[in-house]
Curated annotation (Swiss-Prot):
It comes from Variovorax paradoxus (strain S110). This is ATP synthase subunit delta. F-type ATPases have 2 components, F(1) - the catalytic core - and F(0) - the membrane proton channel. F(1) has five subunits: alpha(3), beta(3), gamma(1), delta(1), epsilon(1). F(0) has three main subunits: a(1), b(2) and c(10-14). The alpha and beta chains form an alternating ring which encloses part of the gamma chain. F(1) is attached to F(0) by a central stalk formed by the gamma and epsilon chains, while a peripheral stalk is formed by the delta and b chains. It is found in: Cell inner membrane. It is a peripheral membrane protein. One of its GO terms (cellular component) is proton-transporting ATP synthase complex. F(1)F(0) ATP synthase produces ATP from ADP in the presence of a proton or sodium gradient. F-type ATPases consist of two structural domains, F(1) containing the extramembraneous catalytic core and F(0) containing the membrane proton channel, linked together by a central stalk and a peripheral stalk. During catalysis, ATP synthesis in the catalytic domain of F(1) is coupled via a rotary mechanism of the central stalk subunits to proton translocation. Keywords: ATP synthesis, Cell inner membrane, Cell membrane, CF(1), Hydrogen ion transport, Ion transport, Membrane, Transport. Pfam families: OSCP (PF00213). It comes from the Bacteria. GO terms for molecular function: proton-transporting ATP synthase activity, rotational mechanism. Its main location: membrane. Belongs to the ATPase delta chain family.
Length: 176
């Protein structure tokens, strides 16, 4: 994992510098390409020595669903030439971190046992922004094993108010 991050960092930084005038647009196509590149079948095809860079680029362009911007084609071509196609999801992650740092925000993942409606999510987001002291881009993932409550992950910080966590704390306290 750390090796992927080390490989991805220079690509993410170079792309960020090259796209400083349109970070949001670049982020949009990069995120979409990262989802496409995460496909195990496409990874296997890209790793095949008989597959040319043009063939892989054609498959990605077809899966993209719209014409790839010229700089996206150039970037993808550079990754394919250097055998770094498999690093694309990590590059997207680091690019998002650079964009967040520039805008002074962070990504937050809220894990919940139950679905959260829009108004409740807005309240949770406001409370979390106050707690963490920065603007957050909140996404929700459902995890029924939490039983109740929420667990929030912002970067390397975790705020766990789930029933599961409290039961674990009680178990440890009773066993001591």
């Amino acid at each position: 994992m750390a090796e992927l991050a080390t490989i991805a960092r220079p690509y993410a930084e170079a792309l960020f510098k090259a796209s400083s005038s349109d970070v949001a647009g670049t982020s949009a196509w990069l995120e979409k390409m990262a989802v496409i590149a995460a496909s195990p079948e496409l990874q296997q095809f890209a790793d095949n020595p008989k597959a040319t860079a043009e063939q892989v680029l054609g498959v990605v362009a077809g899966a993209f669903g719209a014409p790839l911007p010229a700089h996206a084609q150039n970037f993808l071509g550079a990754l394919l030439e250097n055998g770094r196609f498999s690093v694309l999801p990590e590059i997207a992650k680091q690019f998002r971190a650079l964009a967040n740092a520039k805008s002074g925000s962070s990504d937050a993942v809220v894990y919940s046992a139950f679905p959260i409606d829009a108004s409740a999510l807005a309240n949770v987001a406001a409370a979390l922004e106050k707690r963490f002291g920065r603007k957050l881009q909140v996404t929700v993932q459902q995890e029924p094993e939490l039983i109740g409550g929420i667990r929030v992950v912002v970067g390397d910080e975790v705020l766990d108010t789930s029933v599961k966590a409290r039961l674990e704390q009680m178990k440890v306290a009773l066993a001591a």
